[in-house]
Regions:
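Conserved N-terminal Rossmann-fold NAD(P) cofactor-binding segment
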Residues: 2-30, 46
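Short, internal active-site loops enriched in acidic
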Residues: 26-28, 81-84, 134-136
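N-terminal Rossmann-like NAD(P) cofactor-binding module of classical short-chain dehydrogenase/reductase
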Residues: 32-35
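Conserved NAD(P)H cofactor-binding loop of Rossmann-fold oxidoreductase domains
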Residues: 38-40
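N-terminal glycine-rich phosphate/adenylate-binding segment common to multiple enzyme folds
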Residues: 42-44
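Rossmann-like NAD(P)(H) cofactor-binding subdomain of soluble oxidoreductases
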Residues: 47-114
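C-terminal substrate-binding/catalytic lobe of Rossmann-fold NAD(P)-dependent dehydrogenases
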Residues: 93-99, 108-202
C-alpha cells in the first residue's frame, strides 16, 4: 500500500491537489465515502465466483473495524464478486442499505460501449448501451434500449447503408456480449490484473 500511495502521490502535481497516503482504519474516521477494494485478485482462468468464500471472509473481518470509525459514510464496493460482497456487507455491517452501493455492471457497460465504438469506429460518447444483471457471466445487454447517436442499435446498421451495400458487416450481438463478459479475464491473462478501467469507473 505504501508503494502504491507513493507512486500515485508523485503524480499529483499533474492533477487536482489531493492527499494520498497509506493509512489505518482510524484514518477513515468520519469519512463521507468509503470505497472497499479489499480481497484477493482473480488469477488467470478463475471466475469472480471462485473468489467468493475467501473474499466474503475478508469483508466480514474488516467490517467492524471500518464501520467503527465511519458509521455515517456511504460505502461503495468494487471487490469481486461485487454483488455477493455488497450483500454480505449489508447483512453484517448494520449500515442502512441506502448507504451501501456496489459498482455493479458499470465496468461491463464501459466494456460494451468500448467494443461498439471500436466496431463502428465512432466516439464512445456516442454509444448509449447498458449491461444489466450480475457483474459476471450472467450479465446481459437489453439491446432494445441501446442506441448509437440516438439511432436504435437495431436500426443503426441500416442507417449506414450506401449504394454499394453495408459499410460494415452486421453486428453479431452474441459475439459482443461474449467479448464483454470475457474482457476482464483477457486483461488478467495478459497483464495479471485489471487496474485502470475499473479505477476510472469508480
Amino acid at each position: 500500500a505504501k508503494g502504491e500511495a507513493l507512486d500515485i502521490r508523485q503524480g499529483v502535481p499533474f492533477c487536482t491537489p489531493c492527499s494520498v497516503y497509506a493509512g489505518s482504519y482510524e484514518d477513515a474516521k468520519d469519512s463521507d465515502i468509503v470505497i472497499i477494494t479489499s480481497g484477493i485478485a482473480r488469477k488467470p482462468g478463475q471466475t469472480r465466483l471462485d473468489l467468493a468464500q475467501t473474499n466474503v471472509n475478508i469483508i466480514k473481518s474488516i467490517t467492524p473495524n471500518i464501520t467503527k470509525y465511519a458509521p455515517d459514510a456511504i460505502y461503495l464496493f468494487v471487490s469481486n464478486p461485487v454483488d455477493i460482497l455488497t450483500y454480505t456487507f449489508c447483512k453484517c455491517s448494520g449500515i442502512p442499505e441506502s448507504r451501501i452501493l456496489g459498482s455493479g455492471t458499470i465496468l461491463d457497460t464501459a466494456r460494451l460501449r468500448a467494443r461498439l465504438s471500436e466496431y463502428y469506429q465512432i466516439n464512445q460518447q456516442n454509444v448509449h448501451a447498458y449491461v444489466l444483471g450480475e457483474h459476471g457471466d450472467s450479465s446481459f445487454v437489453p439491446w432494445s434500449v441501446a442506441n448509437i447517436s440516438n439511432i436504435p442499435a437495431n436500426a443503426y446498421q441500416k442507417a449506414m447503408e450506401n449504394t454499394d451495400g453495408m459499410l460494415i458487416p452486421p453486428l453479431n450481438y452474441a459475439d459482443v456480449e461474449d467479448y464483454m463478459r470475457k474482457s476482464g479475464g483477457n486483461v488478467i491473462r495478459r497483464k495479471g490484473a485489471t487496474f485502470y478501467a475499473v479505477s476510472i469507473s469508480v
